[in-house]
């Protein structure tokens, strides 16, 4: 990655000696208007530097950014104070994730299926019922401080990303 005053030029090329497909996830963060013209910044986080914690009900959460269960992720100094979790749920497990009160966010299915809702931070809090999320699907979380996740019969892997909303327009190219 090459940081330049005008922006960032991508030059990453993940190594994969086994020739198997690999997955990389990038999170681009919208900055508050006051920070829009600051120098671009890039943080690379390698897998071995990501802490993980056990989840009540089965599974684990890897903390990429933010603080979860008193464990801080390695990506830091981000303006919107994101919580960025890589969650692995065991088959049929149910867990509740506590979010900071002022955060809004989404979940994204990486593997398997899971349901978000069950009367907390998900769709059911609006009386619409829980929402099934499959691989490569995204579900926007409703307001609240808890997210209830229920894994499908084969388990699930998902990203949960939440941050302080800016309540500002998004400015493209700047």
Regions found by a protein language model. Name each.
Residues 1-174:
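Jelly-roll (double-stranded beta-helix
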């Amino acid at each position: 990655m090459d940081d330049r005053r005008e922006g960032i030029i991508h030059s990453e090329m993940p190594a994969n000696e086994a020739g198997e497909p690999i997955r990389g996830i990038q999170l681009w963060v919208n900055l508050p208007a006051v920070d829009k013209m600051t120098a671009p910044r890039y943080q690379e986080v390698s897998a071995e530097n990501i802490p993980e914690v056990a989840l009540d009900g089965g599974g684990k959460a890897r903390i990429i950014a933010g603080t979860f269960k008193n464990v801080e992720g390695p990506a830091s100094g981000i303006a919107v104070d994101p919580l960025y979790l890589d969650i692995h749920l065991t088959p049929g497990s149910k867990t509740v994730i506590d979010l900071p009160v002022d955060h809004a966010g989404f979940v994204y299915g990486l593997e398997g299926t899971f349901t978000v809702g069950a009367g907390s931070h998900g769709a059911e809090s609006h009386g619409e019922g829980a929402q099934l999320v499959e691989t490569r699907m995204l579900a926007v979380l409703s307001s609240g401080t808890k997210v209830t996740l229920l894994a499908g019969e084969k388990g699930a892997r998902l990203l949960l990303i939440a941050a302080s909303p800016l309540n500002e327009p998004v400015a493209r190219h700047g």
